[in-house]
Curated annotation (Swiss-Prot):
Protein name: Conotoxin Cal1.2
Known tissue expression: Expressed by the venom duct.
Organism field: Californiconus californicus
Position of the signal peptide: 1-22
Domain of life where this protein originates: Eukaryota
Location(s) in or outside the cell: Secreted
Amino acid sequence: MKLTCVFIIAVLILTACHFIVADDTGDREWRDLEWLRSLKAHDKRAGCCPTIMYKTGACRTNRCR
């Protein structure tokens, strides 16, 4: 019983911390993901690779100038 209570309290604390941290970083990660998707869409349309993706090796087409 004591172990169960400790586990539940730990989960609640971790969940609260996650939401406090995710409030800022999660939103930023989501924007970064959307930005990366738009870069990939741009890459397919233009036939060139944005510099940031070219450097990471995410695409093998010509780098955009």
